[in-house]
Amino acid sequence: MFNEKDQLAVDTLRALSIDTIEKANSGHPGLPMGAAPMAYTLWTRHLNFNPQSKDYFNRDRFVLSAGHGSALLYSLLHVSGSLELEELKQFRQWGSKTPGHPEYRHTDGVEVTTGPLGQGFSMSVGLALAEDHLAGKFNKEGYNVVDHYTYVLASDGDLMEGISHEAASFAGHNKLSKLVVLYDSNDISLDGELNKAFSENTKARFEAYGWNYLLVKDGNDLEEIDKAITTAKSQEGPTIIEVKTTIGFGSPNKAGTNGVHGAPLGEDERKLTFENYGLDPEKRFNVSEEVYEIFQNTMLKRANEDESQWNSLLEKYAETYPELAEEFKLAISGKLPKNYKDELPRFEFGHNGASRADSGTVIQAISKTVPSFFGGSADLAGSNKSNVNDATDYSSETPEGKNVWFGVREFAMGAAVNGMAAHGGLHPYGATFFVFSDYLKPALRLSSIMGLNATFIFTHDSIAVGEDGPTHEPIEQLAGLRAIPNMNVIRPADGNETRVAWEVALESESTPTSLVLTRQNLPVLDVPEDVVEEGVRKGAYTVYGSEETPEFLLLASGSEVSLAVEAAKDLEKQGKSVRVVSMPNWNAFEQQSEEYKESVIPSSVTKRVAIEMASPLGWHKYVGTAGKVIAIDGFGASAPGDLVVEKYGFTKENILNQVMSL
């Protein structure tokens, strides 16, 4: 039963949120004021989560998908003991732990970075997917070592975003029963009344996806909210609870209007609102001891007991299933097996293979040595070569399966991979054609912001795709991905560079990786293994030519490296001194010392030609004003791939002509 103390706690959360925003003179008070009752009920009655014990693996995950309501989350984190009151007073200020939108690894208790609407909802699907897979893999009768819920607080905006449709469809199809979404349904958007833009039947929509739908008609009714969450936890499949709320509840002049969505109340309205709550407007950032005690005696007590029981269970699990327990402990540590690289393939000089196919060979080896390896493709597994051949598919019936069928849902796949990476216990990946990286670009950006160990496989990387034509031939995508800070964009030149690229991807604890791979075959370069290993990790290195300062530099990535080597050999026959540099990862190269960069691309050599079947954007930094770039300024064409490549000037003869014209 709920009582007056509970109502005091709810109103305290509202007041804290208001004061946090007023102090900053910036923020979104409407959602915290309307959604405080559902958040309070969830945290005090259901959530197994202690923000002071952030490394407890079996905790419930809470995601504020409506990240603009961050003041509510920070208020909850404060009353539950993990965020100092002073941090609320520094909301949205430089160096504070309370940024405008919640940030992963910045504030304890924040599971994923949210703000771009729809992505929190969709990353939550990834969190629930990770829980389901790990539970299927590790749980044994009487030993549910992975057993937690993912709770989401989502807004109208989240559900309008296209990604929510993709993610909800995937979650329903896979019966992710541990996913519970609380939908703050307040009928107001930033611009005004919601019905001017959004009138769909939420119940019919989600039931069509295979979700359970529950309705709480009064968002201030704590008992009904509690019952709905309890019901959701007992049902098969994911559940959405539509909670009808009033945005800015308690504000006499702004409640129920868009005026309270994204701007502070103002001092006069704050005073009237506090009086409506029965609180003293003269007291700012005020929390009574009894409110702290409620969270101490409910949420924190429950979470501590749950963690203690789990630790005891894990000890017994280790006694009964020692090998499985060791694998589980390694997985949740996020570390790789010490000798995981030993079984990775080495490709001999003379081997000819598409880097997507060589990647597929590497994937088979990784799956045997890295048990936490898990992912799939957006309906292109056969083309991406991304499936584990001897593994079962992931499904609601076989959650332990390794191959995820994401379907044609690229954006949701990207967000789900991010969610799995944030969850822990997995080294996740997703795959599609490179040209469709645009469909998940916002997820790639968020992955980089969060600093996740996530891998994205992009195949069919150039105009060499051929017959499918310009809609399927990437041009600007490479430059676009390279522009994302903290993103490893690796375009390997052969099978061995591909192997090392995968090593980088798996080992990059705080940087996501995009692997950009070919459809067409590439010859293995005649380069020693240790040189390739170091060179790919450093982003660029010499693969052919003079160790002394050369007359000419040929710079390239991916499939164009072997073409550059062919041209270099002809130049040498003409008595020219030339060096070929493979540049698979610009991001890594830029992090090297000036001494190393100078050793690879000597500043004294001004006769430089860069070769890449993509936009020239970015290459002029490396070729300088005296150099040339053989690239593509327009779109591709539909014809056999070899012919398209020739017509666009990616031939040995054109390279020689460009070099000799310098």
From Swiss-Prot:
EC primary class: transferase
InterPro entries (UniProt xref): THDP-binding, Transketo_C/PFOR_II, Transketolase-like_C_2, Transketolase-like_Pyr-bd, Transketolase_bac-like, Transketolase_BS, Transketolase_CS, Transketolase_fam
Pfam families for the chain: Transket_pyr, Transketolase_C_1, Transketolase_N
PROSITE patterns in the cross-refs: TRANSKETOLASE_1 (PS00801), TRANSKETOLASE_2 (PS00802)
Signal sequence bounds: none
Cofactor(s) essential for the protein: Mg(2+); Ca(2+); Mn(2+); Co(2+)
Binding, Mg(2+): D156, N186, I188
Site (Important for catalytic activity): H28, H261
PANTHER family: TRANSKETOLASE, TRANSKETOLASE 1-RELATED
Subunit structure: Homodimer.
Protein name according to UniProt: Transketolase
Lineage, highest ranks first: Bacteria, Bacillati, Bacillota, Bacilli, Bacillales
Protein encoded by which gene: tkt
